[in-house]
């Protein structure tokens, strides 16, 4: 078999190779027990085989067999590898089949670097398809390549090896010896000149095998070393295969590749191979590589003897000295090829066997699945039938019962209709009889109409009985009698429309007449009898045609036809014949189709009846089948029905008894509640009386020492002081001589028994509590500066002002104060000092502009000067007034060091280092005395402020803490301070609750438990302000007595004679057309009933009403708040120039001629080059002068020479003598284009036209003979317009021009607009000559000067050089027709229309013109910042100088803006938002205040107008308030007047004024907003609905009443002014003056105690609601 003993020895040594664990390649699969398994190579034992084939020393790395499971693409030729189950697509390869005729291939295709493809697709070790137990590779790893192969097959899907690994492994491969002669293959000659002669794939049979050499370190070479017959030749120096010789000495880095179950790229984490085997000593023993666990189960062949150790050692030593392996000998390649072919064949056999087994297993599996699924299907079908068979049977029975019921209904309906027909026929007969017996014609007509009506109803009922409704198409046909046999009558006559006798009421039909109770009962009895007969199984009575009815109908119709007036006409007359022909035509055109339709309807009805009869007959035929079960079913049904009726009866009886018992219990409970309510009312009345008495006594004791009434009555005006009431108000109880017992027992409020105690005991308890409260306040004030138990006597104790308590004289002005206080201000200082003595807090509520700031500063100066109390003082003010406080303190008291506590968090941290918390006493040299900060920052840093002990805390604009639910109010209440002073010009803004919040803040111990007290006063006083009812004078007097000791208020007119009263004017404006349209649309979208429901409901719908109010207010302000008029321009079909940065373009960017049309006309380059056009001369154009020489001269009839000759010969150009033109001029005109001729004509003077102005008589006209043909020039009327430049003659000569200008046609808007605009089509040619020619044409100086004239610089040069006037080129471009749009079609919004679109803005425009002429300066207040944006555009349009301040203005910008307005008299208007610009700023340089839209809180407007009406104002202040009449603004203004009445009544003590208030209740905000949106009638409906709802809720049982959840939402103030009035350093909103609900500590907040579930979907923040109202969302 083998031709060489070396090959036999190689085969015989195969078993030894397997025994020694040589690294042979195996397949990843094996066959064992006829079940192929595709798994990892290391999981299965090797396949047993009697004679394993010889294998080479090196292996080829192939992908695993699992890749055969992947789908293959059949679009190209496919090669299947049976040893690896891997398919590879080839471009130029044969079918992968084993063919012994092909040249043999060896597995060692990658032994040498020159034989390996440039990029091998296999990066995994080759494995045998038979015995795959482990993956290994030879110690000498084949080199890897980094280049792609250039063979005829595609690259594999495996990842290539990195170049570093490839170069590192190339040095391990040695070339064969130089003198080694191998057998040439079939294609060695063809591969000698190829750079990469071998393909990498295993089964490519078109290539010869490469020369292989044995690995000297493989076990096959070791075992065969002792039996080699021929010694190898002497080793020659190896030839270098690499260009880089440095790689030859580098040891190779072999890689073990992890075997994957699928064909995937080789992993990157490869374990390094042992490289020490190549550098072993000559006689060192070689340790075999440890095989895998699968190799341990390999059976060692028993016929092979055990090797001798000595021989092995000798062989190893011989191999190490040898330079080539056993495969380098002669004949080895041939044996290697035979071994490879046998391996391939064996692999194919294994695969074919596996394929057959796989098919059998698949068939068996599918058969088993089919049987199992069939069994499941049968079982499911059987189960479904068992489960749903009863339901199906019941459904069929229910359908039959329903059909039976429907049939019964049809029968009843049929009987009712037949009865109706009979009744109508009887009525008709009766009416006809009465008509025959009628005495007068009117009564006869009435009865005939009744007869016709009955006949129509009978006809309609008959048609309904037949199954079709009466059609309008057959109304003019005489109604027929009931034809019970079907079909229609053969005789008919045309008649008038029966429906024209009278107009129908409404859109409803006549319908059938109402039946009486007797008729309905009779029909019910008849139907019950029929049903009983059906239930018994009796046969129904047959329904026979009613012959009498049909005959009666015929008789009646005949009688009706005889009623008509007989008109006898001769049959021979033409009128009769014409009438007869017309009737025949009408019958053929109208009546015949109608009769056909009637016939068709009758036929369909008859067929339907027959079909129903057949169905009934079929059902009767099946009746005998159901008689067996019907009686039993009917009995059960009747029994069940009887049981149900009995149960319903007893349930109804029990329910009635239960309801009656509940009603009795409810009545008893209501009676008990009434008794308890009366007792509780009496108890509450005594309780409130006790609280008032206690507070009056406290106020009486404090008022004696503070002398508030005396100071408040004091004034600079003697008349006012004299007119004041002389006697002081007396308290509600007798306190004369009551000094009280200081040691009396104090009774807690909870321990009082208001039911049993008498009035004397309660009065005594009230007096004791009042004295105790006074003593407690004084003790707390004395002990404030002695927290550590210091002694009162001592020289250093200067902070206890007890010595001031008995001082009677007024204190003088402090010397530290660098100003002179007015008399009322000095009295205010004395009042504040007295409060400080008693340890009582107070409210300084002087009107805005009376110097509350300087009075507060004077108190601090007085304490520092008189008692050496230098602080610490805390001043808390709105962010807008912080700079003002700092400047005022530094100006009036320079000795007080002020810390401006604002800025970033880091800055505030530095400022807090100056605070001295260890020492109580502050001296003149302390680092600070006064801290000035804002409300927001104080609340934010409350933890630091609470650690300080403040001597005096002043709160400016104290209405910021008017809500007792806000976190601001709660935080400030916890500050440690000896005294608190509240400064506010408006102590009451909306209701009495706000006043009591301030009182509780200054005296927590006294006003702590006065919720009922506050509710009492609030209800009575506010109801008086709204309903104009009589106020309880005793309550009002007692309230004023309570407030007197704690609040001091003076008004300007009482204390300042030089400051005149401000004039307030309401300016009413009308809605414009556009505003009315918007307003009407909004009103139409509101459902009044929906609005009524929202108004009387709870407060959940308040957000919707808020949005509606905002929308209406925006309409009143300006319609552009909804939609702005945009700039319009036509669609531009062009592209514009673009630049990445304007900084690179320089200061002047030239944008002329930068637009490009999207349409480009490409011109061939040949035309643009030299010689492309014949008329353009050039070096490549030899025929350039052809056109000029021949066409322009020889062939041109307009040449001067030709025209001169023809003119002399009286030929074609003889007319030149009458045209006043020479031959040269005519030739020039002929050669010029249209533009040049127009320029020539426009620049030449028209002398012929001037003759017409001189000789304008018809009989005396001058016509020059040489210009007879110049008709246009002679008839030109242009010279007539230049005769005169003034007077009537000019107007007569320029009628068209003057009329055009006078009628405004030059400024009117065009009636049409261009839809699109585009520059000229762009000409493109890749030639520089074309570009230059375009530039010459576009920028021709002569043409440009003629069109546009010369530039200003050129004209100046001509004037300087004194050139002739003809050198100045005039502008010949005609002026645009429309002076507004000119040459462009871009339309900007009209500012004049912008002004006239709003009634307010138009009225304001006229008002500002007058104010500007009168040298006034204006403060313009707005509610909406978007309206301020629009106003800026208006002021810019009118060229008024203005400045702006709103909520978004930063703090430093705000200070500079106010300073600029105060110092710069050229600023005419100051735009401000009401909340941002209405607090604490001085704008006395303005004398006019305009409210563009008013605030619903009148105190906000009062504060805003007092920015100008304050101390320092020397001019009369006028306040204008713009109100849109007939809109929501009038109702808002009325509500603001009600709030002003509350303030006047509470503070000034006056009675109710003559203000026209309505009788509405102010119980919830939702109702008020609903009232703003409706008129008076709708308001009355809301009041009525509310009363009904209250009554229903009162009468409802306790369990039925709906629970009203108290929901706190942002009111309209917060919503409208969100983001305004906050001047934080970071330019962020700091919270509105009224704390917005939802903040920390507010009820209903998400993080509070009650806000567990958070906000609902309807609940939105104020900012979100404002965005919705503005239309931004």
Swiss-Prot record:
InterPro entries: DBINO, DEXQc_INO80, Helicase_ATP-bd, Helicase_C-like, INO80/SWR1_helicase, P-loop_NTPase, SNF2-like_sf, SNF2/RAD54-like_C. GO terms for biological process: CENP-A containing chromatin assembly; chromatin remodeling; DNA repair; positive regulation of transcription by RNA polymerase II; regulation of TOR signaling; subtelomeric heterochromatin formation; telomere maintenance via recombination; transcription by RNA polymerase II. Residues 583-708 form the DBINO domain. Belongs to the SNF2/RAD54 helicase family. It comes from Phaeosphaeria nodorum (strain SN15 / ATCC MYA-4574 / FGSC 10173). Residues 1403-1563 form the Helicase C-terminal domain. Keywords: Activator, ATP-binding, Coiled coil, DNA damage, DNA repair, DNA-binding, Hydrolase, Nucleotide-binding, Nucleus, Transcription, Transcription regulation. One of its GO terms (cellular component) is chromosome, telomeric region. Residues 394-466, 647-697 form a coiled coil. It catalyses: ATP + H2O = ADP + phosphate + H(+). Residues 833-1005 form the Helicase ATP-binding domain. Disulfide bonds: none annotated. The gene is INO80. This is Chromatin-remodeling ATPase INO80. The lineage of its organism: Eukaryota, Fungi, Dikarya, Ascomycota, Pezizomycotina. PROSITE patterns: DBINO (PS51413), HELICASE_ATP_BIND_1 (PS51192), HELICASE_CTER (PS51194). Residues 1631-1643 have a biased composition (Low complexity). Signal peptide: none annotated. ATPase component of the INO80 complex which remodels chromatin by shifting nucleosomes and is involved in DNA repair. The keyword Ribonucleoprotein does not apply. The DBINO region is involved in binding to DNA.
